[in-house]
């Protein structure tokens, strides 16, 4: 079964990604440190969920950008 994240976790992760896009990576451990540094989270569980969704969101965004670049390249050849 997949993970279901609350809107709050998604919102915080997306805001972090937009603000610190250059620092966010697809590495979960690095993203945990970023969440610790920039978000005042009371529990470790919430921090980990934000970092996990942030990692997943970063992977999705990078894949989407990569696909767009490939499509532009293919259209340019034709």
Curated annotation (Swiss-Prot):
Gene3D superfamilies referenced in this protein's UniProt entry, alphabetically: Ribosomal protein S17e-like
Lineage: superkingdom: Archaea
Family, as annotated: Belongs to the eukaryotic ribosomal protein eS17 family.
PANTHER family, alphabetized: 40S RIBOSOMAL PROTEIN S17
Biological processes, Gene Ontology terms: translation
GO molecular function: structural constituent of ribosome
Keyword Flavoprotein attributed: no
Official protein name in the record: Small ribosomal subunit protein eS17
Organism of derivation: Sulfurisphaera tokodaii (strain DSM 16993 / JCM 10545 / NBRC 100140 / 7)
Pfam families found in the cross-reference section: Ribosomal_S17e
């Amino acid at each position: 079964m997949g993970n279901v994240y609350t809107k709050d976790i998604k919102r915080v992760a997306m805001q972090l990604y937009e603000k610190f896009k250059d620092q966010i990576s697809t590495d979960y451990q690095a993203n945990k440190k970023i969440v610790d540094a920039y978000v005042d989270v009371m529990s470790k569980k919430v921090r980990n969920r934000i970092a996990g969704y942030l990692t997943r969101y970063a992977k999705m965004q990078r894949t989407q950008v990569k696909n767009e670049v490939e499509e532009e390249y293919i259209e340019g050849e034709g």
